A protein has these predicted regions:
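Short, solvent-exposed loop/turn segments enriched in Ser/Thr/Gly
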Residues: 86, 95-103, 144-146, 156-164
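Membrane engagement elements in two modes
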Residues: 1-76
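Terminal connector regions
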Residues: 45-48, 157-189
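Short acidic/proline- and small/hydrophobic-mixed sequence motifs that coincide with surface turns
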Residues: 99, 110-115, 160, 176-177
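Beta-strand-rich interaction surfaces with strong enrichment in secreted/lumenal proteins
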Residues: 89-91, 133-139, 152-153
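Surface-exposed binding patches on compact interaction domains or structured appendages
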Residues: 55-57, 111-143
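Short, acidic/polar linear motifs in exposed loop/turn regions
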Residues: 108-111, 155
Length: 189
């Protein structure tokens, strides 16, 4: 075999190796993509085995909404309003989904109160979401309403989050008070 023929044979073998490596890489990429899509469409699961359940809703940012994971705990009261829970500890929350922790606000006083626009204090993390009042914002004695807080993070916003929610309460006589709620979570894939 001449030197020219030998080099041509080496080029054919190199071409075959390159083709085989490219095909193997493409198959691996397709497999990883299918796995990621399957995890995303099922709601995903954490490393600890927690299964997340979709609500069937899509958030304002176009992300699937999951049932709020974690633990709701405690009760906090002021002169005229009681909030349950006082804290949402969400645990690990996947990226690119939305969760909506919700608090029940109950007028325990003797006069009507008005729930004002909540303000978020970021203790750690970033990017608070929108609040939604699910019910009336003016509560007669003994009346409840729900306050929900939509949270969704994407890559670059991941990591631990700690937020305090200051909810202003105005009385019929014009006096005000604030009830402080909290939400904690670790947003990551």
């Amino acid at each position: 075999m001449s030197n020219t023929q030998h080099r041509a044979e080496e080029r054919r073998h190199a071409h075959r190796r390159t083709w085989l490596l490219t095909a193997a890489a493409a198959i691996a990429l397709v497999g990883a993509s299918v796995g990621a899509i399957a995890a995303a469409t099922s709601g995903g699961s954490s490393a600890s085995g927690t299964n997340y359940k979709r609500t069937g809703e899509i958030s304002a940012m176009g992300m699937p909404v999951l049932e709020t994971p974690g633990t709701a705990s405690g009760t906090i009261s002021t002169e005229s309003v009681m909030a349950t829970p006082s804290t949402w500890a969400l645990g690990r929350v996947p990226l690119n989904v939305a969760v909506r922790p919700t608090w029940l606000l109950h007028n325990t006083g003797t006069d009507a109160i008005t729930i004002g626009e909540p303000h978020v204090q970021i203790n750690q993390g970033c990017c608070p979401g929108a609040f939604t009042m699910q019910g009336p914002s003016t509560l007669d004695p003994g009346v409840d309403t729900n306050l929900s807080f939509e949270l969704s993070m994407h890559p670059g916003m991941d990591g631990p989050h700690d937020m305090t929610i200051h909810v202003p309460v105005q009385h019929a006589d014009g006096t005000t008070e604030t009830i402080n709620l909290s939400v904690l979570g670790n947003f990551s894939d």
